[in-house]
């Protein structure tokens, strides 16, 4: 990692659209409603053993917040929020409890990693879930066209190895897409236009933070 400070913000995925760049080329972008986030706690090396800031985002009915969590928000002097996430940072001097963060934490051209929950697909077979080829369509193949085939020997090893790719529930996993560029920051409307696709459904929670690979360039 470089000495460049890590930045991050929570937001909501609004969907995809396309815009034109300075050379009149079409650029596919994902629109993220970034923030506003509020800093509710600061972790320090001396007290907690690591440096991080705790960010809160999203409206919630105060009656749905339990007492310990409500007390934490009260101590920070902010109203309760729906989502709370910690962001590891090397230096917490730029943050203070109660501080509000908006889309302006990033600049045009910054490289970011985006984390979200992928779309749930339900129970899926091996061809859809793992990309298996399947079995032959003819030449004696009977009613097993989409079956996975053997999952292990009968006597040796006499068991199914851990990690065997099989049918099961697909999606709803935590996914991170790395090294995406911020095409444009719309500070007035609190929007980030991120080049390319990001994980999750429309309206889903996403975490946008400085790219890890190659050091933070934002």
UniProtKB/Swiss-Prot annotation:
Organism encoding this protein: Rhodococcus erythropolis (strain PR4 / NBRC 100887)
Keyword hit for Transport: no
Gene Ontology CC entries for this record: cytosolic large ribosomal subunit
GO biological process, one term: translation
Gene (UniProt): rplC
Family the entry assigns: Belongs to the universal ribosomal protein uL3 family.
Protein name from the UniProt record: Large ribosomal subunit protein uL3
Subunit structure: Part of the 50S ribosomal subunit. Forms a cluster with proteins L14 and L19.
UniProt-annotated stretches for the region Disordered: 132-152
Keyword annotations: Ribonucleoprotein, Ribosomal protein, RNA-binding, rRNA-binding
UniProt cross-references to Gene3D superfamilies, sorted A to Z: 3.30.160.810, Translation factors
A GO MF term: rRNA binding
Keyword field contains Disulfide bond: no
Role summary: One of the primary rRNA binding proteins, it binds directly near the 3'-end of the 23S rRNA, where it nucleates assembly of the 50S subunit.
């Amino acid at each position: 990692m470089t000495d460049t400070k890590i930045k991050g913000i929570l937001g909501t995925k609004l969907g995809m659209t396309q815009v034109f760049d300075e050379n009149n080329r079409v650029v596919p972008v994902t629109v993220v409603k970034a923030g506003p986030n509020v800093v509710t706690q600061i972790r320090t090396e001396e007290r907690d053993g690591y440096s991080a800031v705790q960010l809160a985002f999203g409206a919630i009915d105060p009656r749905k917040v339990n007492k310990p969590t409500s007390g934490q928000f009260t101590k920070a002097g902010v109203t309760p929020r729906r989502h709370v996430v910690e962001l590891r940072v090397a230096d917490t001097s730029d943050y203070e409890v109660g501080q509000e963060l908006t889309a302006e934490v990033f600049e045009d051209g910054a490289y970011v990693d985006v984390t979200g929950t992928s779309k749930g697909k339900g129970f899926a077979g091996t061809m859809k879930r793992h990309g298996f080829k399947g079995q032959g369509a003819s030449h004696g193949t009977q009613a097993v066209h989409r079956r996975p085939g053997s999952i292990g020997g009968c006597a040796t090893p006499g068991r199914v190895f851990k990690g065997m790719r099989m049918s099961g529930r697909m999606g709803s996993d935590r996914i991170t897409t790395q090294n995406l560029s911020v095409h444009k920051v719309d500070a007035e409307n609190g929007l980030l236009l991120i080049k390319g696709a990001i994980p999750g459904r429309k309206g889903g929670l996403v975490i946008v933070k400085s790219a890890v690979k190659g050091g933070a360039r934002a």
